[in-house]
Swiss-Prot record:
Keywords: Cell membrane, Cytoplasm, Cytoskeleton, Membrane, Metal-binding, Zinc, Zinc-finger. Interacts (via C-terminus) with DNAAF11 (via CS domain); this interaction stabilizes DNAAF11 at the protein level. Interacts (via C-terminus) with DNAL1; this interaction stabilizes DNAL1 at the protein level. Interacts with DNAAF4, HSPA8, IQUB, RUVBL2 and DYNTL5. This is Zinc finger MYND domain-containing protein 10. It holds the Pfam family zf-MYND.
Length: 440
């Protein structure tokens, strides 16, 4: 990795060993922020290792120190905070923070964790090390897939239109909504990696995927809706690398990554002997699955030849008798993280929000400067540029950018005009970041 090494092996191990679970009321606190910074560093190192095909010590450290279950618990905890506490904060009339970035870091925490899990779950041993928490992760991914299926058409407003005349908290809510889409897409990838391990998953996990959630039918709905594709002005666009990109006519028959993840997950769930033995092919399931035949074109089979086996399975299914729903009496594990957190915090959402308002998110100028300094140290620009899949985007209009804000060095712009228009929103964070840099 040479000059681009972010963490030395000893440093990475210290960060991994220190990972722990936090209570919901602790989110955004000093200790929580330090762990968030650690996760971001581990995230960048894991991506950097994978990008330049180096040995991948981050997932090994997470496995060896038993931290995958901790990451799953933190993921679900921040998901619950966003659903239960964040809306209360947004409704508090006496909460008008001068800077929303500390809250943004909590909102962004879910994206940080799911991104790290997406990077490391590519390796089957990571899934195995999740132990019984893989049940909770399956439930989490199912919730995100439901959001994707329910998502309306992809006619998003431009960032400029979305944030026009918004208060800082309203803008933060809109950013959280945009972030939720990307989080859900990463959850789809994590779920696909879990299905790669279908032959070694517990019966409880298989039953959860196939009977409780009926994931094969849900995946068929995802293929039908294709929420990561849209048409704008007659042009096909796919959501890739964090933004909507126009697909050239010559590339439109090419399988995109997210469709590929769905097909591989379906292949794993329908053709694995272990999964087939647990899946009940009811008349509803048969009707849903046979919809796949229309998608299995020669062009698709050329790109994913293994799907020929799936095509054969569907041909056999079309002639097979359906089964009534099975009502076996089975003792099995159930996910516990969401229910436990909800039980522990029931009736306390308002109190948690007010506690965080007073003790976590109402920072002094000095505290904000210190945080800005830590953020600047965490997000190493040379590393971010090395792992970025493409050129930076303009912070105002999202066009390809070549100029960086000279004061804070954190935000890119395509032209001077966009920088001037964005200053009203960017200014305070920019000044704090610049002051933090000078304080080093």
């Amino acid at each position: 990795m040479g000059d681009l090494e972010l963490l030395l092996p000893g440093e990475a191990e210290v960060l991994v060993r220190g990972l722990r679970s936090f209570q919901l009321r602790e989110m955004g606190s000093e200790g929580w922020n330090k762990q968030h910074e650690s996760l971001e560093k581990l995230n960048m190192q894991a991506i950097l290792d994978a990008t330049i095909s180096q040995a991948e010590p981050i997932q090994e450290l997470l496995i060896n120190h038993g931290k995958i279950p901790t990451l799953v618990e933190e993921l679900i905890a921040v998901e619950m905070w966003k659903q239960k506490v964040f809306p209360v904060l947004c409704r508090l009339e006496d909460f008008k923070p001068q800077n929303t970035f500390p809250i943004y870091m909590v909102v962004h925490h879910e994206a940080s964790i799911i991104n790290l899990l997406e990077t490391v779950f590519f390796h089957k041993e990571v899934c195995e090390s999740a132990d019984d928490k893989v049940l909770d992760l399956v439930d989490y991914c199912h919730r995100k897939l439901i959001l994707l299926v329910a998502r309306k058409g992809g006619g998003d407003l431009s960032e400029e239109e979305q944030f026009q005349d918004s208060t800082p908290m309203q803008e933060l809510q809109k950013q959280a909504e945009m972030m939720e889409f990307e989080i859900s897409l990463k959850a789809l990838s994590v779920l696909r990696y879990i299905t790669d391990c279908v032959d070694s998953l517990s019966l409880s996990t298989l039953n959860r995927m196939l009977r409780t959630h009926n994931l094969p039918c849900l995946l068929v709905e995802l293929l039908e809706h294709s929420p990561w594709s849209r048409r704008v002005g007659g042009k096909l666009q796919h959501f890739e690398s964090g933004r909507w990109q126009t697909v050239a006519p010559s590339e439109q028959q090419k399988l995109n990554k997210l469709d590929g993840q769905v097909w591989i997950a379906l292949y794993n769930l329908l053709l694995s002997p272990e999964a087939r033995a647990r899946y009940c092919l009811t008349s509803f399931a048969k009707g849903q699955l046979l919809k796949l035949q229309a998608f299995l074109t020669d062009t698709l089979l050329d790109q994913l030849p293994n799907l020929a086996d799936l095509k054969g399975f569907l041909a056999h299914l079309s002639l097979a008798e359906t089964q009534p729903p099975k009502k076996d009496l089975v003792l099995e594990q159930i996910p516990e993280i969401w229910d436990r957190l909800e039980r522990e915090n029931k009736g306390k959402w308002q109190a948690i929000a007010k506690h965080q308002l007073q003790h976590v998110f109402s920072l002094s100028e000095k505290d904000l400067r210190q945080q800005a300094q830590r953020w600047a140290e965490t997000y190493r620009l040379d590393v971010l540029e090395a792992v970025a899949p493409e050129r930076p985007r303009c912070g105002y209009c999202n066009a390809e950018a070549s100029k960086r804000c000279s004061r804070c060095q954190n935000v890119w712009y395509c032209c001077r005009e966009c920088q001037v228009k964005h200053w009203e929103k960017h200014g305070k964070t920019c000044v704090l970041a610049a002051q933090g840099d000078r304080a080093k």
